[in-house]
A protein has these predicted regions:
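Hydrophobic, proline/glycine-rich low-complexity stretches
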Residues: 1-100
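HotDog/MaoC-like acyl-thioester-processing domains
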Residues: 1-10, 84-170, 238-276
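A contiguous, surface-exposed recognition patch within enzymatic or periplasmic domains that forms
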Residues: 2-42, 156-211, 218-221
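Short, glycine- and charge-enriched coil/turn segments that flank and shape catalytic ligand pockets
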Residues: 31-38, 131-134, 225-226, 253-254
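Charged, low-complexity, helix/coiled-coil-prone segments
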Residues: 43-48, 64-75, 124, 148-164, ...
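Catalytic-pocket segment enriched in acidic/His residues
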Residues: 195-252, 258-272
Length: 276
């Protein structure tokens, strides 16, 4: 199928980086207190710029329906499951709390592949974040749409020895609160019967962007003097509550660090950070 008419389509969102919303993120992630005028921490922009759709515009999984009408941003890919596969960031300057910001989203690429479980459709979105007409953050997000199949829950990539390691065990309350912060209706994060009986997970699924946030936070907490220039990350398999895991990091050279989620000695999610 040709998706040529969708390539280059754009959406624009303008929102205040509201201090009250920031305080909710602080409470959820147990982070340090922040106020108006402070820099928004890395990846917290995901808790802003999220479209408020009415229930009739949502699909069976709680995500926006695809190809709803001729004006839809996304085409229809049929009866598919959605996964946040990974992404890349260039950090030019931080967003500032208390100021208005604009996000412009562009469909950059739609690519079909054949996988072991059937057809895979990869969508790459570009998100550009601005304040006072200055580009602050460039992001590329990879979304995977796949035919219903048992989810991958293991990895054969052995975790390396880490410089820093922090044990974590998210619970369902944390998942619910993060879903609320990001206005994410995906049922795999809060609807146990749907997650287990429809999509085949053994429990509620931990958000990919939350895990990406944990990984970058691991580096920031242990290297607060370093400025991150860019960050790439990807998920290798899903993690569910109440699974415990370690968030780990290791500096590889003068301006590169690897970060990952260690689940029983194997890598579940991974990322690369370039810093100065």
């Amino acid at each position: 199928m040709s998706y040529e008419n969708f390539i280059g389509k754009q959406e624009k969102f303008t929102e205040n980086i509201n201090e009250k919303q920031v305080q909710k993120i602080v409470a959820t992630l147990q982070s340090k207190q922040l106020k108006n005028g402070d820099a928004l921490p890395y990846l917290w922009q995901w808790c802003f710029f999220n479209e408020a759709l009415t229930p009739d515009k949502l699909g069976r999984d709680g995500h926006p329906k695809l190809g709803l009408d001729k004006n839809s941003f996304f085409p229809s890919f049929g009866e598919v499951n959605r996964m946040w596969a990974g992404g890349r960031f260039n950090f030019i300057a931080p967003l500032i709390i208390g100021e208005d910001a604009t996000k412009i989203t562009t469909i950059k690429k739609i690519q079909e592949k054949q996988g072991k479980s059937g057809k895979l459709t990869f969508v790459t979105l570009e998100h550009c974040y601005y304040q006072k007409e200055q580009l602050k953050i460039e992001e590329e997000q990879d979304i995977l749409y796949k035919q219903p199949a048992p989810p991958k829950l293991t990895s054969d990539v052995v975790a390396m020895n880490a410089d820093y390691s922090e044990k974590m065990q998210p619970d369902s309350t944390l998942l619910f609160r993060y879903s609320a912060l990001t206005f994410n209706g995906h049922k795999i994060h809060y609807d146990f019967p749907y997650a287990t009986q429809v999509e085949g997970y053994h429990s509620l699924v931990i958000h990919g962007p939350l895990l990406a946030t944990y990984m970058i936070n691991c580096f920031v907490k242990n290297h607060p003097d370093k400025q991150i220039i860019n960050y790439s990350y990807r998920g290798m398999h899903a993690l569910c509550v109440p699974d415990s895991f370690a968030v780990e990091s290791k500096i590889i050279d003068n301006n590169t660090a690897e970060v990952w989620i260690n689940k029983n000695g194997f890598v579940a999610h991974s990322g690369t950070i370039h810093f100065k």
